[in-house]
């Protein structure tokens, strides 16, 4: 067992020790001078400050701001502020007085009237007017004629083709109530005009349902799913339950709980840490609704899942986005499908391996019980005849391979295919006689004349540089 090391207790501060040990006289020798300020450093500062004055420089135990003027870099002068100049008063003129001048100063008399310069306007007085009246005492006489026959007046009007009466137009009736535009005019005009039909967006013609003339918005374009982006993890699902009940891959099924609708977005809550039935669906909190897409010639069933791998203290969930997909079936062209159907129709429907089975679709073969298929010494291409109960025999060529033992051989035709040999045929080399080693014995030889001429050697000149000195 490892021994625990004892921790060192911190010593009390000098101020705390001074308060407790001053009265009893048990203070350490370095406590009292430090608290009372009688150390050697304090005495040097105390007596040295009597002969040296550092006022205004901020040297000492101050705030370290450099005093009132602050710190100034060496070799530079602090910027001086411009002193604002006060306005100079004009000098007062002093009259010189001689000895013979009078000592009485004449005063200037002030007048109470101020001459404005322009005369005051005068208001004209109304002069009045004369009214002359006259009175006539003669009574008024009215001449009244007797009532005669009534006169008939006729008025005839002629139509002027160069002038037409302007038509009086009234505001049209509101078209929102019934959906029809009605224009009325009390007079008939002969103006030529073009009748332009107006489009109305009112659908209902019922006067009870009040609609507006706002056009109906069209369908929005289909947004991109973004299933194959860089931030989305691609996971292929093989389990068929992913199509019908995807919740079984995330959580374990509870029989007492109502089933999920696979066409909606599924939300999951994980209260405790438990593994998912499928490890690919671990930490899934949401499975969005499915989408059918076609990619690379297949019909793909896709769902986007949201994981909650991390959870912060504030409750925010952080996780990756996963694209789960399952390919349903390949999309093939029409011609390939027709060709496959024709090939499928030619295949045999009888899959029995009994020797008594009959395939009526392609051939009729009846094999005997004779053990002829275990002959391992048969040649490369042999013909085996099977006896049947019919009046004729059918001879079918069989290929047993390169003399290899057969474990089992199902009855049926063996179609021989032409096998091309990969080895090339042997071609003899002419001459057929082998070469013998020829040995020539001799003590002398003749040199070819081309070797008598010696090559001229090129002279090698040493290269020296005038500005370089090499030490030997």
Swiss-Prot record:
GO cellular component terms listed in the entry, alphabetical order: host cell; host cell endosome; host cell Golgi apparatus; host cell nucleus; viral capsid
**InterPro entries from the entry?**
Late_L2 (IPR000784)
Which GO biological process categories is it annotated with? microtubule-dependent intracellular transport of viral material towards nucleus; symbiont entry into host cell; viral penetration into host nucleus
**Keywords assigned:** Capsid protein, Cytoplasmic inwards viral transport, Disulfide bond, DNA-binding, Host endosome, Host Golgi apparatus, Host nucleus, Host-virus interaction, Late protein, Microtubular inwards viral transport, Phosphoprotein, Viral penetration into host nucleus, Virion, Virus entry into host cell
As annotated in the record, motif Nuclear localization signal runs over: 1-12, 453-461
Q: Which cysteines are joined by disulfide bonds?
A: 21-27
Outline the subunit composition. Answer: Interacts with major capsid protein L1. Interacts with E2; this interaction inhibits E2 transcriptional activity but not the DNA replication function E2. Interacts with host GADD45GIP1. Interacts with host HSPA8; this interaction is required for L2 nuclear translocation. Interacts with host importins KPNB2 and KPNB3. Forms a complex with importin alpha2-beta1 heterodimers via interaction with the importin alpha2 adapter. Interacts with host DYNLT1; this interaction is essential for virus intracellular transport during entry.
What is this protein's function? Answer: Minor protein of the capsid that localizes along the inner surface of the virion, within the central cavities beneath the L1 pentamers. Plays a role in capsid stabilization through interaction with the major capsid protein L1. Once the virion enters the host cell, L2 escorts the genomic DNA into the nucleus by promoting escape from the endosomal compartments and traffic through the host Golgi network.
Query: What family does the database annotate?
Result: Belongs to the papillomaviridae L2 protein family.
Q: What is this protein called?
A: Minor capsid protein L2
Gene label: L2
């Amino acid at each position: 067992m490892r021994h625990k090391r004892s921790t060192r207790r911190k010593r009390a501060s000098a101020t705390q020790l001074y308060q407790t040990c001053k009265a009893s006289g048990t203070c350490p020798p370095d406590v009292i001078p430090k608290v009372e300020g009688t150390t050697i450093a304090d005495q040097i500062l105390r007596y040295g400050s009597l002969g040296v004055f550092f006022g205004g420089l901020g040297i000492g135990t101050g705030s370290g701001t450099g005093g009132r003027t602050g710190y100034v870099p060496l070799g530079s002068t602090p910027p001086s502020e411009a002193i604002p100049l006060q306005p100079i008063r004009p000098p007062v003129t002093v009259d010189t007085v001689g000895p013979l001048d009078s000592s009485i100063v004449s005063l200037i008399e002030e007048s109470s009237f101020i001459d404005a310069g322009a005369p005051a306007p005068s208001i004209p007085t109304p002069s009045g007017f004369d009214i002359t009246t006259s009175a006539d005492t003669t009574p008024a006489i009215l001449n009244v004629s007797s009532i005669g026959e009534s006169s008939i007046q006729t008025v005839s009007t002629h139509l002027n083709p160069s002038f037409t009466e302007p038509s009086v137009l009234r505001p049209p009736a509101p078209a929102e109530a019934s959906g029809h535009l009605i224009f009325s005019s009390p007079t008939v005009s002969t103006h030529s005009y073009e009748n332009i039909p107006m489009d109305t967006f009112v659908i209902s013609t019922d006067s009870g349902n009040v609609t507006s003339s706002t056009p109906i918005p069209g369908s929005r374009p289909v947004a991109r799913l973004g299933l194959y982006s860089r931030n989305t993890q691609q996971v292929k699902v093989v389990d068929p339950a992913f199509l019908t009940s995807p919740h079984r891959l995330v959580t374990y099924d509870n029989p007492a709980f109502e089933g999920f609708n696979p066409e909606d977005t599924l939300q999951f809550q994980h209260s405790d840490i438990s593994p998912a039935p499928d490890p690919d669906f671990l930490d899934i909190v949401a499975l969005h609704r499915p989408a059918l897409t076609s990619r690379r010639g297949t019909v793909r069933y896709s769902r986007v899942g949201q994981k909650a791998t991390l959870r912060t203290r504030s409750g925010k969930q952080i996780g990756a986005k996963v694209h789960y997909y399952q390919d349903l079936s390949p999309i093939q062209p029409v011609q390939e499908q027709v060709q496959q159907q024709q090939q499928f129709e030619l295949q045999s429907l009888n899959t029995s391996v009994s020797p008594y089975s009959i395939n009526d679709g392609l051939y009729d073969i009846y094999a005997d019980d004779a053990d002829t298929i275990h002959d391992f010494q048969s040649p490369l291409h042999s013909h085996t005849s099977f006896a049947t109960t019919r009046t004729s025999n059918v001879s079918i060529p069989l290929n047993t391979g390169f003399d290899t033992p057969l474990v089992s051989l199902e009855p049926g035709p063996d179609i021989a295919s032409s096998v091309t040999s990969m080895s090339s045929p042997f071609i003899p080399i002419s001459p057929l006689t082998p070469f013998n080693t020829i040995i020539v014995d001799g003590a002398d030889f003749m040199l070819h004349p081309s070797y008598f001429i010696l090559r001229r050697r090129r002279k090698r000149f040493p290269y020296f540089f005038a500005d370089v000195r090499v030490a030997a």
